Amino acid sequence: MNILLTNDDGIEAEGINTLAELLSKYHNVTMVAPENQRSASSHSITIYEPIIVKQVKKPYNVEAYSISGTPADCVRVALDKLVPDNIDMVISGINKGLNIGNDILYSGTVSAAIEGSMYKVPSMAVSAQFIKNKKENYKIAAKYALDMLNRLKKEDLKNDVVLNLNIPFCSEEEIKGIKVCKVGNKIFNTRFSEEIDEEGNKILKLEGDINEDIYDGTDVYYIRNKYVTLTPLHYDLTNFNILEETEQLFLS
């Protein structure tokens, strides 16, 4: 398969390079990723500035480019200019940290995959749980991504669907299996701490703690119970539950 590989942690991040090294043994890989760290970019794109594209050398068999823009920019530039007619699948990751629950709305990793689906290319986001002061399990995540890719080769995956794959932080032997599940609620209870600087300005810093109020059967629930989670996503944000009800407001 011809694969476009991107991320939001930057082209030198360990996660994307671990995945690129493994995938390039079995597939044709083109890496197009942000020049710098762009986590939590969501689906932002560059409008008022030029985008700089630089070719980058890698020690394994991939064609690689760094992009001065966002993760979504990377996919747009790749599919419009760099490899416009030759991509079977977009893979975004491996992200440093989970993209589950409400956090997917902020995620540059997930948004890059969604951008791929908007170009009618089947896409997948891959994320590995991050725990402070511990080594991320990128190699385990890469193996699961490759396995998922091999499974998808045999299926007629709809091109407007994004698969969101998340791997818990534990040994491979501790992983209980894979759960296909829905998106959960928030992972963290966040708040801003406040300080005042010498000029009287407020300095706000985002803080938070783990949200213990989680729902059974969701990605948040299964990750905490050491399952790999897989959730199909879609970029159509229409709330169909109240579409007809909303329409009635204008019929009276």
UniProtKB/Swiss-Prot annotation:
Single GO term (MF): metal ion binding
E.C. number: 3.1.3.5
Entry binding sites for a divalent metal cation: 8-9, 39, 95
Keyword tRNA processing (UniProt): no
A Pfam family matched in the record: SurE
Catalytic activity as recorded in UniProt: a ribonucleoside 5'-phosphate + H2O = a ribonucleoside + phosphate
Subcellular location: Cytoplasm
Superkingdom in the source lineage: Bacteria
GO cellular component: cytoplasm
Keyword Cytoplasm: yes
Record's cofactor remark: Binds 1 divalent metal cation per subunit.
Keywords from the UniProt entry: Cytoplasm, Hydrolase, Metal-binding, Nucleotide-binding
Cofactor(s), names only, from the UniProt record: a divalent metal cation
Predominant cellular place of this UniProt entry's protein: cytoplasm
Function as written in the Swiss-Prot or TrEMBL entry: Nucleotidase that shows phosphatase activity on nucleoside 5'-monophosphates.
NCBIfam families in alphabetical order: PRK00346.1-4, PRK13933.1, surE
Family to which the UniProt record says this protein belongs: Belongs to the SurE nucleotidase family.
The protein's name: 5'-nucleotidase SurE
